[in-house]
Curated annotation (Swiss-Prot):
Protein name according to UniProt: Capsid protein
Family statement drawn from the similarity comment of this UniProt entry: Belongs to the geminiviridae capsid protein family.
Job of this protein: Encapsidates the viral genome into characteristic twinned ('geminate') particles. Binds the genomic viral ssDNA and shuttles it into and out of the cell nucleus. Plays a role in protection of the genome from degradation, virus acquisition and transmission by insect vectors, infectivity, and systemic movement. The CP of monopartite geminiviruses is absolutely essential for virus movement.
GO CC annotation: host cell; host cell nucleus; T=1 icosahedral viral capsid
Organism the protein comes from: Maize streak virus genotype A (isolate Nigeria) (MSV)
Keyword DNA-binding set for record: yes
GO MF assignments: DNA binding; structural molecule activity
GO BP of this protein: symbiont entry into host cell; viral penetration into host nucleus
Effect of R6T: Abolishes nuclear localization
Disulphide-bonded residues: none
Gene3D superfamilies associated with the record: 2.60.120.20
Consequence recorded when altering K21N: Abolishes nuclear localization
Keyword terms: Capsid protein, DNA-binding, Host nucleus, T=1 icosahedral capsid protein, Viral penetration into host nucleus, Virion, Virus entry into host cell
Length: 244
């Protein structure tokens, strides 16, 4: 029986392994990576004390992307901005007129995008075109058919409030207790992915008259006539883009 012997050269070739060099971590970094992106700017709108929001029957509409021209973090630095995220934190407190009655109501908050504001903020009735007979029922409102090309509802949230015919300072008799009700509620929302692009005129203020295209409104309406005041703040996360 014959056996074949491997040569030493064959053994040395057999033991050799082809190794591939791993690319360096520096080579994996690409231009425009997350680490290189500028951080979002923040604007905070506070409503408390004399600046609280009064929400009457029929609702209220406020411009919230009020980025004035400037160098601070909350200012726009260019002629165009992109609003990405919004954090909303408010206490809704039923007013004295509403507390006189035992009532419950479903209110609504919307974020509404206005493609062409035209220098003046609209009213909730302009946006939703509700008849007076539905003024107290905002959950039924829809954007006007004639203006659906202009107004776009980005977000919509419902909330419930109630009153029991008493105000918060009333004191129950010693032999009784009153069940708590939702005359004072905390409303919190955080939403992202808005992508609201705003083009600004060549002016320095941040009012609706300075917006050429792309206003963002916060619309709040009480349900069943249960009017209230709003105390808290709205924080907007945005970027300045486009030309100087």
């Amino acid at each position: 029986m014959s056996t074949s012997k491997r040569k030493r050269g064959d053994d040395s070739n057999w033991s050799k392994r082809v190794t591939k060099k791993k690319p360096s971590s520096a080579g994996l970094k690409r231009a425009g990576s997350k680490a290189d992106r500028p951080s979002l700017q923040i604007q905070t709108l506070q409503h408390a004390g004399t600046t609280m929001i009064t929400v009457p029957s029929g609702g209220v509409c406020d411009l919230i992307n009020t980025y004035a021209r400037g160098s601070d973090e909350g200012n726009r630095h260019t002629s165009e901005t992109l609003t990405y995220k919004i954090a909303i934190d408010y206490h809704f407190v039923a007013d004295a007129a509403a507390c006189r009655y035992s009532n419950t109501g479903t209110g609504v908050m919307w974020l509404v995008y206005d493609t062409t504001p035209g220098g003046q903020a609209p009213t909730p009735q302009t946006i939703f075109a509700y008849p007076d007979t539905l003024k107290a029922w905002p959950a039924t409102w829809k954007v006007s058919r004639e203006l659906c090309h202009r107004f776009v509802v980005k977000r919509r949230w419902l909330f419930n409030m109630e009153t029991d015919g008493r105000i918060g300072s009333d004191i129950p008799p010693s032999n009784a207790s009153w069940k708590p009700c939702k005359r004072n509620i905390y409303f919190h929302k955080f939403t992202s992915g808005l992508g609201v692009r705003t083009q600004w005129k060549n002016v320095t203020d941040g009012g609706v008259g300075a917006i050429q295209r792309g206003a963002l409104y916060m619309v709040i309406a009480p349900g069943n006539g249960l009017t209230f005041t709003a105390h808290g703040q709205t924080r907007l996360y945005f970027k300045s883009v486009g030309n100087q």
